[in-house]
Amino acid sequence: MILHKHETTGGLVVLRKFKAGQTIPAHAHPEANEWAYVLEGEWEESGTIYTAGTLFFAPKGTHHGPHIARTEVISLTVFDGPLTVE
């Protein structure tokens, strides 16, 4: 769910929910840095486990992932530019 979109930069604030076992393949965001704050659950990212209260950061253009929801996960994610994926 998009909570806010910046009119000038295209940056986004997104509330995301993942079902347990859901996987997002490795990817990069060429136009935006990504910050994901885990509100609930357990998320595995490139071999690192993130739990409620932890913050993940992926610099613009950096390949990261796969994302694996080890449990149901709710996160608040910020992209500081347009959300593009490669």
What are the residue ranges of the model-derived segments?
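Short glycine/serine/proline-enriched coil/turn segments at secondary-structure junctions
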Residues: E7-G10, G47, H67
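Glycine- and acidic-residue-biased ligand/ion/polar-headgroup-sensing regions
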Residues: A20, H29-E45, A52
